[in-house]
Amino acid sequence: MNAATGMSGYPAARLSSFYFFYYAVLGAFTPYWSLYLESRGLGVTAISVLMSLWYATRIVSPSLWTTLAARSPQPIRWLHLGCALAVGSFALFLLPLNYVGLFVVMTAFCFAYNAVMPQFESITMSHLAARSDRYGLIRVWGSIGFIVVVASFGWLIDARRLGIGALPWLMLPVLAAVLGSALINRYAHDPDASRTAADEGFRARLRQPHVIAFFVAAFLTQVSFGPFYTFFSIYLSEHGYSTATQGVLWTVGVLAEIAVFFLSSRIFRRWDAARVLMFALLSASVRWLMTALFPDNTPLMVLAQLTHALNFGAFFAAAMQLLVRFFPGRLNGHGQGVFYGLPSGVGGVCGALLAGQL
């Protein structure tokens, strides 16, 4: 990770490793997990319900976990606990579970895995401090991890004929690496466990109109991405795309996202984060129209995926900038919890469930 370790003053390699392995897991989960559930004989509605648990648990676990961590004398232990629970619960997918069993295990895994990232974002920001414009240079390793797994797992499942049933076995070692990375990371300084004044300041900021508008925009964005993350691979399969080709299309989007993260510090020196956010929202509407109208036109599907640079990469980088602005210092952990919880959680589950009924 030479690009990451080249930045002095904070543990770039350690921070980057967590993003790499965390999003590598999502590189398998996001495009292929619905196909895995389908291979176990589940129908569209059942898959929709199970996949919606990823978003449903986001409603509760991020804010709960960040609050518990913030009030703990050793908050880093909550990161370790969450990662350990994610590994342990995911291992249960190796068992021959019925639908109820899948529901319970999926709930436990999604709860734990969603819980840890907002806390780690706060850890990252504690190291970056005034250099938050360099966040993209750390976060980009998550996109690289995602793309490595999307491409390699698609090849292993399709070309090497391991079959989609091998997916949990392939994912488990990557999850173990997430736990390993969590164990070598820590806060830049020990957070203050006395939170009364901070909690009051957070609630006051949360009521500000521009902060409310930001969270509404984030909510609507996640509603639109819910169907994409849940059913895009199945949608591609129905239109004749092989598993390997699906992996390529997912990879194209993340490659575009990587470019934006690498350029993010330059972008935010030129344009305000709020303006970047609005442009990202506009690009999302164009993307979904192209995906709906031209599923059999491969070049246009590639072009639609390239807009991921804007409607995810630019959106997310701008959101992190705004969260630092809206919730500075020790308020950032709470802000990250709300961002991952309410807009992403409620918006995502609404999008996934609505898509399952269409």
Language-model segments: which ranges?
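Juxtamembrane intracellular "pre-TM" segments in multi-pass secondary transporters
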Residues: 2-10, 185-220
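Helix-loop boundary and gating motifs at the non-cytosolic
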Residues: 5-58, 210-249
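Hydrophobic core of transmembrane alpha-helices in multi-pass small-molecule transporters
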Residues: 20, 89-90, 99-117, 219, ...
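Loop-to-transmembrane helix entry/capping segments in MFS-fold secondary transporters
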Residues: 44-45, 129-141, 243-244, 327-340
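Helix-to-loop junctions at the C-terminal end of transmembrane segments
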Residues: 60-74, 157-158, 259-273
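Structural signature of the two symmetry-related core transmembrane helices
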Residues: 77-91, 275-290
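Cytoplasmic helix-loop-helix junction between adjacent transmembrane helices
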Residues: 107-141
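Symmetry-related core transmembrane helices of the 12-TM Major Facilitator Superfamily/SLC fold
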Residues: 166-183
